[in-house]
Curated annotation (Swiss-Prot):
PANTHER family linked: ZINC FINGER SWIM DOMAIN CONTAINING PROTEIN 4, 5, 6 (PTHR22619), ZINC FINGER SWIM DOMAIN-CONTAINING PROTEIN 4 (PTHR22619:SF4)
Keywords: Metal-binding, Zinc, Zinc-finger
Keyword Nucleotide-binding: no
Sequence segments annotated as region (Disordered): 1-32
Gene that produces this protein: ZSWIM4
GO CC terms, sorted: Cul2-RING ubiquitin ligase complex
GO molecular function: zinc ion binding
Pfam family, one: ZSWIM4-8_C
Zinc fingers (SWIM-type), renumbered ranges: 139-176
Protein name according to UniProt: Zinc finger SWIM domain-containing protein 4
Species of provenance: Homo sapiens (Human)
UniProt keyword Zinc present: yes
Amino acid sequence: MEPPAAKRSRGCPAGPEERDAGAGAARGRGRPEALLDLSAKRVAESWAFEQVEERFSRVPEPVQKRIVFWSFPRSEREICMYSSLGYPPPEGEHDARVPFTRGLHLLQSGAVDRVLQVGFHLSGNIREPGSPGEPERLYHVSISFDRCKITSVSCGCDNRDLFYCAHVVALSLYRIRHAHQVELRLPISETLSQMNRDQLQKFVQYLISAHHTEVLPTAQRLADEILLLGSEINLVNGAPDPTAGAGIEDANCWHLDEEQIQEQVKQLLSNGGYYGASQQLRSMFSKVREMLRMRDSNGARMLILMTEQFLQDTRLALWRQQGAGMTDKCRQLWDELGALWVCVVLSPHCKPEERAGWLQLLSRWDKLDVCPLEEGNYSFDGPSLQPTMAPAPELLQKGSTCITNTEGWVGHPLDPIGCLCRALLEACRLEEETLTLYPDSGPEKRKVAYQHVPVPGSPGESYLVLALEVALLGLGQQRALPEGLYAQDKVVRNEEQLLALLEEVELDERLVQVLRKQAGLLLEGGPFSGFGEVLFRESVPMHTCARYLFTALLPHDPDLAYRLALRAMRLPILETAFPAGEPHPSPLDSIMSNRFPRWFILGHLETRQCELASTMLTAAKGDPKWLHTVLGSIQQNIHSPALLFKLAQDACKTATPVSAPPDTTLLGIALELGLQVMRMTLNVMTWRRREMVRWLVSCATEIGPQALMNIMQNWYSLFTPVEAATIVAVTGTTHATLLRLQLDTSRREELWACARTLALQCAMKDPQNCALPALTLCEKNHSAFEAAYQIVLDAAAGGLGHAHLFTVARYMEHRGLPLRAYKLATLALAQLSIAFNQDSHPAVNDVLWACSLSHSLGRHELSAIVPLIIRSIHCAPMLSDILRRWTLSAPGLGPLGARRAAKPLGADRAPLCQLLDAAVTAYITTSHSRLTHISPRHYGDFIEFLGKARETFLLAPDGHLQFSQFLENLKQTYKGKKKLMLLVRERFG
């Protein structure tokens, strides 16, 4: 901080000898204050000391001392305001980094030392303990003050911040709390006037000697100017005295580091994309509001500095050049800026000349090109560019269902309802006796206390009642949703801020009567009310307001509360888009931005609608009449499956408390909502469907077995076959579910039968995905299992893929049914086709398993499957692999097969001779195919391929001759490939 500047020039009057002025000591409690102190207090806070000296030619020294004594600020609230943040510190820091808190700790630890007040100047030393291993640090602090305001500060620390450092706070609080312990002296000019020439010379020389390194150049320069007769310093009467207080013309305001404020705002705006930057700017706005509340002129000064930096934000020109709107965070900051200017200009405490100066400033700023519009969504100024008029029927409807002024009071740029409501509540607010850094924040936030303050001239009225009436009047007004994303978002935010104010008010009997009266008026308000019977389709919904009214009225008038909330459940824009009885084109996408391009906040409004419905369901627990009424309203007005599902979950959770029996009616409501969600999303693919289906089964389980069987019996309209077979039937028959239901044997079998019927129906409808789950579910019932098996056989003829058939066949083998597994494997092979070059076909392992199965069953099954293998598989390596596997052991030696041969089958005998011929033919065909487009880098692979072919050829009695003829044929046919043929000769001769 910079050292305080010299104040005003003073003459050197010959004052009386200094007398003791010990009147600063605190007076005993209950004793009247001296007239001298009463007068000095009033003068000290209203008049500059220069004005006192001009008015009275001689001011006695005791009077001077009392005026100087009382000129220092007397309240810690101002010190706190100029040394604390406007928002709570991060979690865990416990205000440790707030200068006011640190200064208070320094004061309480005895760190303040050598405090001296000379006139209007206070100085002292602050000893701050160092970090572990570091020495104690000493800081010298100087404070200048005038008319109960600190006008400048100086500290030896390097802390550069918007407000006072902890050392300034410690010294200021010491002066306020221990004023009688501070040594008090009159301004230094008064002391100098009592010295003769020798004393003055000695004083100056001692001063220069003590600080020669700092003041010697300045002292020599001043001496030269004084000795020069025509110098400027000799033309001025008197000399400056930094301890003599401010002059008459000097501004009387608290010290504010303007340069630091400008730098801080500039830096924060450049980091505007970060949450912390916006938070700190809001903190500065809060500080301005605090200053305005305390009628501190620095509020307007600080706001001017901030506005200038906002207008110099480089992003404004960029957004204007690109034709893009400003970000949401930035728009909110500009809104706050505008709201503060409204408070400043309309303040009843400002002077007319101040207001005129501010208006001139605002007009100049408004003419700047970069100054953003208050509503940036209206960009067409020319009459020819205006949007065309809406269709006549819509205009007629709008005229009959909406008030003349379509611009609502809530969400208006000037926020008339919010300002009026806050002003009325401020008049009723009880003052806090204790000093609090953050009265509106923190985990231990106390509820604000309000009291009824009567309105003068209006018997029976109070400002608190008026505040409630005004707020409900604005919130319940029917108003069209404005154009543009930000304007719509502002409507929502203003509404929430207004309701937050109302929630702070504790409702007594008087306010409850007002609430009931206003609720009745809103229900009967016609087109002027958002709760009226007829709404314009683009009216702002009343969900948030209705939720507050419902909660407030419920203990006092439940019938009125439900009627109001049910009326507010409407969302007119969706009622128009989805007429009753018509199917929704896309149930999951109720927003449908292409159909509602202007309703940017529709998702938020639907969420608020859901919250209102959830509140009503929770409140209606135990009341079947209202529960079914609320359910009907939900089914009629809520069109989002995701929100309906959330409502169903909330209702189920509320209906099943941990330490109480479940509410069966509310559980039924939850199930009904879940069923509606299932029907709405049946034909829509969404990642949440599986979660929804599982939850529905668990909800039905909570109700009982009949509910579970009902959803199984009506699965066609609720689930896909896969969901029904793999989730509903399986989950509904798990051990945990059966234990939960606590069924006897007959009821358990009834549930199992229902699940098996469901599984068979799903298998018939979608055998490809449901056949195996159906077989698994029907394992314990022979007839059902046979029916499921027959469904698989029928589906195989109808196009069931080989992969699914192989899967079911493996399942059959695992179940100990090898013949059925063999049957399904042959059906799968009949559909399979593996080309000569598909060595890594996905079905290779399945084919080898099928061959192994047939070999284990016996020669008859092996003979039957060979033609299928030859017809389906044309890959030579696969055929030779199968052939070798079958020749390793005798058929029928498997664990389930009969021993029908004493030795392995020969490859040259039936039934394997056909397979051998097929393998040889496949090798010959594949070789010719590969040689057609072979490249030199594949010669090595081809030679290896011929090596495997020779092994297969040699399985035949005349295999050696066949292979030699095959090679000769290759050499003659492909004699142009000399290098390849050379490699063939080297390997095979």
